Swiss-Prot record:
<feature type="binding site">
    <location>
        <position position="411"/>
    </location>
    <ligand>
        <name>[4Fe-4S] cluster 2</name>
    </ligand>
</feature>
<keyword id="KW-0520">NAD</keyword>
<dbReference type="GO" id="GO:0051539">
    <property type="term" value="F:4 iron, 4 sulfur cluster binding"/>
</dbReference>
<dbReference type="GO" id="GO:0022900">
    <property type="term" value="P:electron transport chain"/>
</dbReference>
<feature type="domain" description="4Fe-4S ferredoxin-type 1">
    <location>
        <begin position="353"/>
        <end position="386"/>
    </location>
</feature>
<keyword id="KW-0677">Repeat</keyword>
<comment type="subunit">
    <text>The complex is composed of six subunits: RnfA, RnfB, RnfC, RnfD, RnfE and RnfG.</text>
</comment>
<dbReference type="GO" id="GO:0046872">
    <property type="term" value="F:metal ion binding"/>
</dbReference>
<dbReference type="InterPro" id="IPR010208">
    <property type="entry name" value="Ion_transpt_RnfC/RsxC"/>
</dbReference>
<comment type="function">
    <text>Part of a membrane-bound complex that couples electron transfer with translocation of ions across the membrane. Couples electron transfer from reduced ferredoxin to NAD(+) with translocation of H(+) out of the cell. Essential for energy conservation during autotrophic growth. Contributes to ATP synthesis during heterotrophic growth.</text>
</comment>
<comment type="similarity">
    <text>Belongs to the 4Fe4S bacterial-type ferredoxin family. RnfC subfamily.</text>
</comment>
<feature type="domain" description="4Fe-4S ferredoxin-type 2">
    <location>
        <begin position="396"/>
        <end position="427"/>
    </location>
</feature>
<keyword id="KW-1278">Translocase</keyword>
<keyword id="KW-0004">4Fe-4S</keyword>
<dbReference type="GO" id="GO:0005886">
    <property type="term" value="C:plasma membrane"/>
</dbReference>
<dbReference type="InterPro" id="IPR017900">
    <property type="entry name" value="4Fe4S_Fe_S_CS"/>
</dbReference>
<dbReference type="GO" id="GO:0009055">
    <property type="term" value="F:electron transfer activity"/>
</dbReference>
């Protein structure tokens, strides 16, 4: 048995609702609402206009920035609006609304057929960048950036994250069972790009069928499939790297600092589709689950489908949910309405009942220390939450390693005072980012002033 990481928690995995449900293809809704911001990095700008006819797989928004990701039409039809619409992370965001024409026709040239073994690393990275692929476990970092580490970072191991440790979510689990050929191709493509010979597939040991399926799929390769102790957040990058390689990502560091790159199952499938068939990222497997959902399912759904349309495909609600979550219950975000769209990083939609939710009235920290024991990053969550209440982001960053927090929610799960620790930490991070932007603007203004003074001399 592998040694586990320090900290973590053991919530009920609640995967019984959908673990044995094969992936179903969701119908294409009458309209898709495709946000231009679905990734970490520079936002994209529309390259289509209201009234344009578009095909499935056609580029509709792009950015010339390196850290960004193209956006594509998820079906064919007419662009009926470009404006601000509900967004799961930003409240409202510019989105391109496409009314389907019922034909679902591909843009010319897609799909195609390519042998990845005959492509150069540069060609494959270009294809992945063009296809708009991001990390599909929720982080949504552009994959072409992650697969091109700086020359001074010597990567020697790739890790496929098959842990899927968030309760309720089974999209990756079903994908490993049903699309193992694409998973294998995606891993092999990544290994060629990174020029590594060592790779691991890490899967929690509460998924024996997935472990068996992956061992069979990777038989005869240099990829090692490993059953991991079931403990949340086993699927966090830094935890996976530590358990599988013994390496510890330093404070403020990245996986590449210790020679590792991690991607999840859905991302590998998207890479296979793009490199082998030329298909951009226009759909994904998403879990629709929770006690309020009438027929929980794993669905292959088009980007831009609203939560309402996805839930309706699952029979709607059997009772009024007390909470709707985008993602999983530990790291996901509560939503106030069902008009928001499924995006590239939408791993799940949860409709939770009162019995599903461990909510309660928040009170002051009682200094019990449970959150410190649960934190896998060796932080002091209680102090960070207190600093969040006091708006002391600088102190949180410099003295309590704010930016090392992975927002896993283990602290919240263990807190008897029901403190919203992760919310405070997210607030501190947002304030820190805002301060950084203010400093950049101040420096730019000072530089401009100095240049003007030089001209006038």
């Amino acid at each position: 048995m592998l040694k586990s990481f320090r900290g973590g928690v053991h919530p009920d995995d609640s995967k019984k609702y959908t673990a044995n449900k094969p992936i179903e293809i969701a119908p294409i809704p009458d309209k898709v609402f495709i946000p231009v911001r679905q990734h970490i990095g520079a936002p994209t700008s529309p390259v289509v206009q209201k009234g344009d006819e578009v095909k499935k797989g056609q580029l509709i928004a792009k950015s010339d920035a390196f850290v960004s990701a193209n956006i594509y039409a998820s079906t064919s039809g007419k662009v009926v609006d470009i404006g601000d619409y509900p967004h799961p992370g930003f409240g409202k965001c510019q989105a391109i609304v496409i009314e389907k024409d019922g034909k679902d026709e591909w843009v010319e040239g897609i799909p195609t057929s390519r042998n990845w073994k005959e492509l150069s690393v540069k060609e494959m990275l270009g294809i992945i960048r063009e296809a708009g692929i991001v990390g599909m476990g929720g982080a949504t970092f552009p994959v072409h950036v992650k697969l091109a580490p700086p020359p001074d970072k010597k990567v020697d191991v790739f890790i496929l994250n098959g842990a899927e440790c968030e309760p309720y979510l089974t999209a990756d689990y079903r994908s490993m069972l049903e699309n193992s050929d694409k998973v294998v191709a995606g891993v092999q493509i990544i290994m060629k790009i990174l020029n590594v010979e060592k790779a691991f597939v890490g899967i929690e040991d509460n998924k024996p069928k997935a472990i068996e399926a992956m061992k069979k799929a990777f038989e005869g390769t240099k990829v090692q499939v490993v059953g991991l102790p079931t403990k949340y957040p086993q699927g966090a990058e830094k935890m996976l790297i530590n358990v599988l390689t013994g390496r510890e990502v330093p404070s403020g560091g990245l996986p590449a600092d210790v020679g590792a790159v991690v991607q999840n199952v859905g991302t590998c499938i998207a890479i296979s589709d793009a490199v082998e068939r030329g298909i951009p990222l226009i759909q994904r497997v998403t879990t629709i689950s929770g006690g309020a959902i009438k027929e929980p399912k794993n669905i292959l759904v088009r980007i831009g489908t609203t939560f309402k349309d996805a839930i309706d495909f699952c029979g709607g609600f059997k009772e009024e949910p007390v909470k709707i979550i985008s993602g999983g219950p530990m790291m996901g975000f509560a939503q106030s309405n069902l008009d928001i769209p499924i995006m590239k990083g939408s791993s799940g939609i949860l409709g939770l009942t009162k019995n599903d939710v461990n909510d309660g009235k928040e009170s002051s920290c009682i200094r019990c220390g449970r959150c410190l024991k649960a934190c896998p990053m060796h932080l002091n969550p209680s102090m960070l939450s207190i600093l969040g209440q006091k708006d002391l982001y600088q102190e949180a960053k410099e003295e309590y390693n704010l930016l090392d927090c992975v927002e896993c929610g283990s602290c919240v799960y263990t807190c008897p005072a029901k403190r919203k620790i992760v919310q405070y930490i997210r607030y501190l991070k947002s304030e820190n980012r805002a301060a950084g932007e203010r400093e950049k603007a101040k420096a730019a203004k000072a530089k401009e002033k100095k240049e003007k003074e030089e001209v006038l001399k």
